[in-house]
Design a protein with these regions (language model features):
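Acidic/His-leaning functional-site neighborhoods
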Residues: 155-162, 167-185, 189-190, 195
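A structural microfeature
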Residues: 51-53, 122, 164-166, 194, ...
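Conserved donor-binding loop and adjoining core beta-sheet/short helix segment
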Residues: 8-9, 29-83, 92, 166-180
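Short amphipathic alpha-helix that is part of the acyltransferase structural core
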Residues: 1-32, 119-165
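Conserved acetyl-CoA-binding loop-helix of GNAT-fold acetyltransferases
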Residues: 77-90, 181-184, 190-207, 225-230
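Residue-level recognition of the GNAT/N-acetyltransferase active site
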Residues: 68, 72-76, 103, 185, ...
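Conserved active-site tyrosine of GNAT-family acetyltransferases
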Residues: 109-118, 228, 233
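Conserved beta-strand-loop-alpha-helix junction that forms the acyl-donor binding cleft
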Residues: 99-110, 214-225, 241-244
Length: 244
């Protein structure tokens, strides 16, 4: 088995990775994808021209890298991922920690991170409020008490909402909105101000265009997760975040 290392992928390598992903998705209907463009290091395990395992390392900060890896279903439990991981760690500073996102629909992935001794940090929930639920909130919030600012993050158009108690951001996409950066000021939490701000923002979006609203929330933040569920958001997928 040969393990190649690069900072970018060739068209041929991408094609091989897509075939590998297809084999994995057929075995387990996971939602994880492979970052073919933005990673800092790519490690590919080959045997006789056949791609057995692909891993990507993406720098999060000076001492933390996110690791995304897929191994062919018929090649698992043979030490291939372990060999790729060892090679990947040799590229990084000695005290580097790795983050793994694991779809609970993949028992093999859960088994792999457990065998590594990785620590479960949190469950990350992708949630969505359907467009009809957004429409139903129209007129419920007093949007007159809301400041709305248009801005750009790189090439992405966003709306920044704020009131006297907090703020949140909405990324604008053609088919949906993405909610992030929801903060209520210290000392004002647990008093209903988060619910009020969220309803005002959703009412504004319903007036603008009632598209689905998506977000990613941490299972470790119980109050926020409870707020989203009370407002009508539903879990669409759950990824477990592990630290190694």
């Amino acid at each position: 088995m040969d393990i190649t290392i690069s900072s970018s992928l060739t068209p041929r390598e991408k094609d091989k990775i897509f075939l590998l992903l297809d084999a994995c998705y057929k075995k387990e209907p996971v939602s994880l994808t492979f970052p073919t463009e933005e990673a800092d290091h790519y490690l590919l395990a080959w045997e006789n021209g056949r791609l057995l395992c692909a891993a990507a390392l993406l720098k999060e900060d000076e001492t933390v890298y996110e690791c995304t890896a897929f191994t062919r279903p018929d090649c698992r439990r043979n030490g291939i991922f372990g060999a790729v991981l060892e090679k990947g760690l040799s590229l990084l500073p000695e005290d580097t920690e790795l983050l793994f996102y694991v779809d609970k629909k993949s028992p093999d992935a859960l088994e792999a991170v457990t065998a590594l001794g990785a620590e479960l940090l949190s469950d990350e929930h992708m949630m969505e409020l359907a467009s009809d639920a957004v429409s139903a909130i129209k007129g419920m919030g007093k949007t007159g008490y809301l400041t709305v600012t248009e801005a750009m993050e790189g090439e992405q158009a966003i709306l920044v909402f704020s009131d006297a108690h907090g703020s949140l951001n909405i990324s604008l996409y053609g088919t949906h909105y993405y909610l992030y950066g929801f903060e209520i000021r210290e000392g004002q939490r647990g008093q209903g101000f988060g619910t009020s701000l969220l309803i005002k923002v959703l009412s504004f979006l319903a007036e603008r265009e009632p598209l689905p609203v998506t977000l990613q929330g941490s299972g470790s933040n119980g109050p926020a997760h409870s707020l989203y569920k009370k407002t009508g958001f539903r879990n669409t997928e759950t990824l477990s975040r592990y630290l190694y």
